[in-house]
Amino acid sequence: MSEEPVDVLIIGAGASGAALAWSLAETRMNILCLEQGDWVKSDDYPSNATDWELRRLGDFGFSPNDRKLASDYPVNDSESPIAASMFNGVGGSTILFAAHFPRLHPSDFRVRALDRVASDWPLDYRSLAPWYDLNERMTGVSGLEGDPAYPQDPPKRPPLPPLPLGQLGETLARGFNKLGWHWW
């Protein structure tokens, strides 16, 4: 282990820690991320295989209470309305993340004006669009060009290609295609 001093120490290289490290990477600062758990090879990510739906029930399940890996510790969330979704390793819970970051639709910012409910946002979609773009580049969002869930003007291809559909997803896609329904 190096004993060289560091300028920035980041505890946890999950979504927040990795975003901070990414934003500082082009500086001349010496950055160190400490993480509980091991490296997971990208080839081992469950989202890279068609059996990912089954793998989510085992070593890549959301709850450390179910996984019980050596790096896991029990979490008591019985009194919480929020169930734990945690993973200990470089990347943290982003290891469980399938690069799905749906954008709000432009009309979501104008619910009062359009639907007479709640309040309109103090900003609009176009104000957030550059930040959506940055997040998608940084986190490696995948998808299909033209997906209406990701409104972009002009339309752009997501930074990464779509993840493979699981066996259930392929079955549903075939059924939707047979019916002429839009499935993505």
Language-model regions: role of each:
Residues M1-A113, V117, P122-R126, P130-L134:
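N-terminal glycine-rich phosphate/pyrophosphate-binding loop and immediately adjacent elements
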